[in-house]
């Protein structure tokens, strides 16, 4: 099939640019993973080294021209990093919630011990009372408080015989422990709402959101009448769940903004620099309202820059390949192609024949067809036209080989057979005011 063709071109230049953009976003994703883990207190140096090793392996793929593998694996790696970071945040939240529950249990136990000591008429030292009432010291003060509840030693005035008898009587008796004492106390029911609050508060902390206003309200619930506690707790839980949802979304948006800023870092245009500055200010100010618009703007700019790069690279690759095959390619033809939508190249060895290139302006599809130069008034040698169209078939295959050898590729989307349509005739008359680079040739259909 060597008649008019519609084809796609992928160049090594385009593939390298796309892969480098992927790697920049991967670097930003690794930095985001590190930041999240450090903030949550779950940083793992060994895992961080593994992340870096995988990143280095992916970069080696670029050096080895393994473009397809890299473009598949980098998005998967970024997805894994995000998922892993979220899992670690959730684990940190669970651990923090458990710590909150433990502190709450310790505070309850300390209050119970103080009440028991007071009821037993024990003299509680001021420092012990202070330690039992302070959350950070309550747990370690409990053993000392419990010791005051334990049976007192025998009176020092007792005789040796009395002490010996008491020792024999208690020899096989198990001494009560704090756990035994707690087991004998009325059970304190931990509300499900308290556990959920702890989890939400912990996740807010892990997300970098200040949980103190919610924590203060949660603490104040204990002072409310029991008839109102459930209603207030439900209301607080709704607000906490909403805050966590917003925190996750904001964290994801800012992470995406940082990745986009990293991808824009190689673009030194005025527009890209200004956009990077705006992204930086939005992230620093935690301006979630402008994040969505900035993300859309950054993606549009990146896509447009890549489209222009890819389009220019495709035109250059095709023109350079045709020059290698003996077609006359002049400086400025790429520009003429962009401006005019098509360009005609003459075959140096057979100047009465050539090819016409078009497309690539509004889509990534290019068109090519063999053409003949001459006059509409002159008779055509149809047999020779068919022969030259067949020659172009083999030359197009060589063009595919050349582009492939440079790391790119050409894929034919649609092609007609030799002779399926008459050879397009280009009126070979150049106007005096035209240059060699841009020929405004009158096109006639024979």
Regions found by a protein language model. Give the residues of each.
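Amphipathic alpha-helical assembly segments used for oligomerization, scaffolding, or translocation
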Residues: 1-330, 351, 385-389, 444-445
């Amino acid at each position: 099939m060597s008649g008019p063709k519609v084809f796609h071109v992928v160049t090594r230049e385009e593939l390298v640019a796309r892969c480098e953009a992927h790697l920049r976003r991967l670097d930003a994703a690794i930095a985001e993973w590190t930041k999240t883990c450090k903030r949550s207190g779950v940083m793992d140096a060994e895992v961080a080294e593994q992340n870096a090793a995988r990143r280095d392996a992916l970069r080696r793929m670029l050096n080895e021209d393994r473009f397809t593998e890299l473009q598949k694996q980098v998005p998967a790696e970024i997805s894994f990093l995000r998922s892993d970071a979220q899992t670690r945040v959730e684990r940190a939240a669970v651990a923090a919630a458990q710590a909150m529950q433990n502190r709450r249990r310790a505070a309850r136990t300390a209050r119970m011990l103080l009440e028991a000591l007071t009821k037993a008429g024990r003299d509680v030292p001021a420092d012990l009372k202070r330690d039992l009432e302070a959350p950070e010291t309550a747990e370690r003060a409990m053993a000392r408080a419990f010791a005051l509840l334990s049976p007192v030693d025998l009176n020092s005035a007792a005789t040796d015989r009395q002490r010996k008898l008491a020792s024999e009587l208690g020899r096989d008796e198990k001494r009560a422990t704090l756990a035994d004492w707690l087991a004998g106390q009325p059970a304190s029911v931990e509300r499900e709402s308290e556990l959920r609050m702890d989890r939400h508060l912990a996740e807010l902390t892990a997300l970098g959101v200040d949980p103190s206003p919610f924590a203060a309200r949660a603490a104040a619930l204990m002072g409310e009448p029991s008839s109102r506690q459930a209603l207030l707790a439900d209301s607080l839980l709704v607000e906490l769940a909403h805050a966590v949802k917003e925190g996750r979304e904001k964290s994801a948006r800012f992470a995406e903004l940082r990745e986009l800023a990293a991808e824009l870092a190689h673009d030194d245009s005025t527009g890209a620099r200004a956009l990077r500055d705006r992204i930086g200010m939005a992230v620093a100010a935690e301006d979630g309202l402008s994040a969505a618009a900035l993300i859309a703007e950054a993606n549009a700019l990146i896509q447009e820059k890549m489209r222009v790069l890819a389009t220019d690279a495709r035109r250059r690759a095709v023109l350079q390949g045709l020059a290698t095959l003996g077609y006359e390619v002049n400086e400025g033809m790429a520009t003429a192609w962009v401006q005019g939508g098509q360009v005609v190249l003459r075959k140096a060895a057979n100047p009465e024949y050539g090819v016409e290139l078009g497309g690539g302006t509004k889509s990534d599809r290019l068109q090519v067809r063999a053409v003949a130069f001459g006059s509409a008034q002159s008779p055509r040698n149809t047999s020779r036209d068919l022969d030259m169209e067949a020659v172009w078939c083999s030359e197009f295959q060589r063009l595919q080989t050349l582009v492939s050898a440079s790391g790119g590729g050409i894929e034919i989307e649609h092609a007609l057979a030799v002779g399926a349509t008459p050879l397009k005739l280009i009126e070979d008359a150049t106007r005096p005011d035209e240059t060699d680079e841009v020929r405004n040739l009158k096109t006639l259909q024979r």
